[in-house]
Each structure stands twice: as C-alpha cells, then as structure tokens.
Amino acid sequence: WSSDVCSSDLGYQLPADYLEKNLLYYLKRTSHGSTLSRIVHAQLAEMAQFHELSWQLYQEALYSDYRDIQGGTTAEGIHTGVMAATIHVTLATYAGVDTRQNELSICPNLPEHWQALAFQFIHQGVTYQFSLTQTSVTITADKDTQLLVQGALIPLTAERPKEVHYQ
C-alpha cells in the first residue's frame, strides 16, 4: 500500500499489524458523524482482512441516504461523496482494479455474499468489460492490450473474451 511506501521513504518501519491496531483504535472512538466515515472504514477494514466488518460498513454506507440513517438529512439531498466512494470501494477493493501502475491490474476479492459482478471500465483509451465470479474473471477489451490478473500478465485480443481462473 502507498502508506507503506511513504513510511519507508521517510525512514519509518511500521509493524505488520499497524493497520489493524489503528483501525480498531479509531473505530472505538469515531461517531461516524459523516456518512462518508463508514465507507472509509469499510475500505480500511477490508485492507486489514476484517471482511465481515468491511461488508457491514459498506452496506451502511451504501444505504445511508436511501434509509436516511442520520434521521432527516436525506430531504436535504444525497451525499454524492458517499455514492462515489461506494463505487470506488466496489471497483478498487472488491473487484480489485488498480490503475496506479503502467499496466491495469485486477485482483478480485469479492465479498462472499456476492456471486458475481460485471462492469465496464475505461483505462488509457481501452474499454474493458469485466465479468467476475468468486473463481474467475472474463475480460473483453475493445483493442489489443494486456493487463495483470492477480499478478500474471494476460494478453488480450480485441473483442475476444478471455477467461482467467483464480482462487
């Protein structure tokens, strides 16, 4: 994670459990006064391998406006930041899409409650169609390209679906 790189570059060596300890510390102290708090903590919980907690916080964030969990704020409008963040967590955390390197990378980590996830994603002028299950991903790109699936470089031919199994 980028925080590990940043800390290392600054000369700090963080213990392996720093994320878990900090997450648990702050969860005991946060009021979740903003609905955005839940989705941020969902992301962190997944990073710390607290899958059930991540799922619970994700659901709360997803339904925060719909169910008006703060008692009357939905009439004032929806929180587009939370909406965008839930999409980000869906794609970056659960689907595992990573655009931080030169090659597009996907490392699926679907919640066990999900059987499948399908979405379109445009990266560097290439349109990808992804269809994920718990054990495979099928990818179609509109141009010849390549991407990483769980660290393995996968070549794609334009408009030809490629299925990759993982576990």
Residue ranges, per PLM feature:
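Non-catalytic C-terminal accessory modules of carbohydrate-active enzymes
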Residues: D9-S31, T35, V40-Q167
